[in-house]
Amino acid sequence: MAADHLVVAMLLLLALSPPAVADDTAVLGRKGGVVEGQAAGPGRYAVILDAGSTGTRVHVFRFDNKLDLLKVGDNIELFAKVDPGLSSYAGRPQDAANSILPLLDKANTVVPARLMNKTPLKLGATAGLRLIGDEKANQILEAVRDVVHTKSKYQYNPNWINVLEGSQEGSYIWVALNYLLDKLGGDYSKTVGVVDLGGGSVQMAYAISSNTAATAPKVPEGKDPYVVKEYLKGKDYNIYVHSYLHYGGFASRAHILERKDGPFSNCMLRGFSGNFTYNGKQYDATAAPQGADYHKCREEVVKLLKVNAPCETKNCSFNGVWNGGGGAGQDDLYVASAFYYIASHVGFINSDAPSAKSTPATFKAVAEKVCKLSVKEAKVEYPNVRDHAYLCMDLIYEYSLLVDGFGLHPSKEITLVDKVKHGEYYIDAAWPLGTAIEAVSPKKRLREIYK
């Protein structure tokens, strides 16, 4: 008798469930998660908090029933940021949680009150929080969960507030970028690759062939896999993705200074005396009396990358990491975040342009010029730069990362990207868009509730 009631209940559930619609105009679906073409409902919102190492950002996206982006207010998304990042509050979890309240207030101005309890709110903490240790990170995340649960009306799931795995971050960036460029739905060779340089880590992601994916090295249990499988606009993609923790822009400064030979740094501009603070620790950043030395600094940077580390596979990038084997999915390469910021601030690309073509060699040429300057001269020459004293170091690191780390030819054309033109709007080429699309999928949310 109980079994009969169970069958009736299941039939009723199926009858009441919205039908899956196969439609080539759907944006994307993750195999085993999002079903392509399933209606998201008119005016569905998603609130995504990007908790990076330097600050926390909120993105509010709105989608139609085909998961195409709709306007939020007068723009295609709402964006706001607070400084510093959650990791700066290590040991002060409540202060960390309270730091996101202004972002929730900002989201409240655009998400209709009647839709808040149906609007998923997700927080992905990236490299900064990974670096402060599990105990302190978990304390902060628990405090954030409590704030979201008790002080907001958004749809709450504790699993949606967590440290973002490196492979997730990289694959979401790849999905967002290729979606915005309308590259999805065709062969993997038509997609673009991406290198994203954050404060604490750098991600490389690009599509590879199924044959290459089959040769991916096994990784120890608990480590992110090298290949993430995605089902996007009717096509299967094997995405090589790796997050190099401790190799972000700010993390690299700390490690370069930590390893300096003697009391002075070969990478700091002449006239600078002081400390660099990263994750609560101070590093002496005093420049040599004669100033920066391009060649000595570059030697230190290449040594940091460990390009000659033992490689257990046929192809490695740096620090003994498999490089994905290369191929057509890496031919058209976009480089984002810190790469774009420094290039636009020193002026070798237009700071008003959302993206621009360049080469790694340009980073080298500017570095050779910058390293000869004093801090005072650099401030005059490059008024838009924020951390003038580190300019030589940063340029050398980014050049070395591209050429020595990822094996690019110095003259290879790359695209420096901040935003992507999609329709009439310019949208951030970042991971929050990828996770937002998944968050508004009814099938994915239903599966998360019942698993």
Curated annotation (Swiss-Prot):
Keyword Secreted on entry: yes
Xref: InterPro entries: GDA1_CD39_NTPase
GO cellular component, one term: extracellular region
Principal cellular location given in the protein's record: secreted
GO biological process: nucleoside diphosphate catabolic process
Positions bearing carbohydrate: N275, N315
Residues holding ATP: 47-57, 193-203
Signal peptide from the UniProt entry: 1-22
Enzyme class: hydrolase
Gene Ontology molecular function: apyrase activity; ATP binding; nucleoside diphosphate phosphatase activity
Required cofactor names: Ca(2+)
Reaction(s) the record says it catalyses: a ribonucleoside 5'-triphosphate + 2 H2O = a ribonucleoside 5'-phosphate + 2 phosphate + 2 H(+)
Top-level taxonomic group: Eukaryota
Gene3D superfamilies: 3.30.420.40, Exopolyphosphatase. Domain 2
Location in or out of the cell: Secreted
The EC number(s) this enzyme carries: 3.6.1.5
Record keywords: ATP-binding, Calcium, Glycoprotein, Hydrolase, Nucleotide-binding, Secreted, Signal
Active site: E169
Family recorded in the similarity comment: Belongs to the GDA1/CD39 NTPase family.
Protein purpose: Catalyzes the hydrolysis of phosphoanhydride bonds of nucleoside tri- and di-phosphates.
Annotated PANTHER family: ADENOSINE/GUANOSINE DIPHOSPHATASE (PTHR11782), APYRASE 3-RELATED (PTHR11782:SF82)
Protein's UniProt name: Probable apyrase 3
Organism for this UniProt entry: Oryza sativa subsp. japonica
